[in-house]
């Protein structure tokens, strides 16, 4: 609550006269996005870092995403973030994918590098940075992940890329994502050499041994 209050106060102090013809554009593309606090965080970060950029939200869905990306690219946008429902659809519209984005098949950050759109997935990286900041090294360790949502898959991929010996994913066998996650685990193992296995949540023995 304090953080939100601080950001809101900063937003109220924001001077629109600071925006000029040189100000770079960055954005969030998703639907819905009106509730997002991303503009508060990013615009305050730009201010503190002395960067001449502005961050806006655009309500864009999977159907309108291709036209939106083409238009933003033409206008020279420096980069943009993706939120639901666009993280998977954006992949086919990009020129290049980072290693983790290739493994996950989803992108939340796009950089416009002189007209070449490069996609990244920063969810796993952000999580692993927090782990490192807490003084932990996952190299050669087993990672246990509960759930098969987008953030979970990103953490699995980043764990494998960062040197984990194994990743154990626990999910409901009745989940509609079970088969997709099984293929993801097999592909991640083959591409990284990390042993990635999928277990049923009800396999309490496997869960206990993994933890």
Task: Identify the residue ranges that each predicted region occupies.
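Phosphate/diphosphate ligand-binding glycine-rich loop within oxidoreductases
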Residues: 18-134
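Active-site glycine-rich loop that binds ribose-phosphate moieties when present
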Residues: 126-131, 137, 150, 154-155, ...
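Short acidic low-complexity segments
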Residues: 192-211
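Short, Lys/Arg-enriched N-terminal segments with co-localized hydrophobic residues
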Residues: 1-15
């Amino acid at each position: 609550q304090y953080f939100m209050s601080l950001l809101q106060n900063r937003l109220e102090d924001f001077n629109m006269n600071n925006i000029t013809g040189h100000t770079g554009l960055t954005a969030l593309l998703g639907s819905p996005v009106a509730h997002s606090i991303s503009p508060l965080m990013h615009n305050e970060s730009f201010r503190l870092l002395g960067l001449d950029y502005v961050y806006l939200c655009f309500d864009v869905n999977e159907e309108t995403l291709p036209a939106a990306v083409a238009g933003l690219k033409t206008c020279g946008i420096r980069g943009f973030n993706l939120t639901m429902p666009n993280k998977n659809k954006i992949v086919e519209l990009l020129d290049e994918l980072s290693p983790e984005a290739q493994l996950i098949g989803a992108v939340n950050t796009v950089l416009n590098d002189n007209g070449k759109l490069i996609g990244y997935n920063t969810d796993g990286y952000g999580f692993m940075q927090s782990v490192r900041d807490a003084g932990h090294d996952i190299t050669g360790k087993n990672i246990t992940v509960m759930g098969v949502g987008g953030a979970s898959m990103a953490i699995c991929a980043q764990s494998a890329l960062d040197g984990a010996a194994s990743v154990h994913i626990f999910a409901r066998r009745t989940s509609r994502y079970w088969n997709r996650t099984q293929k993801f685990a097999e592909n991640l193992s083959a591409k990284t050499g990390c042993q990635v296995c999928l277990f049923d949540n009800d396999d309490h023995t496997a869960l206990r041994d993994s933890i």
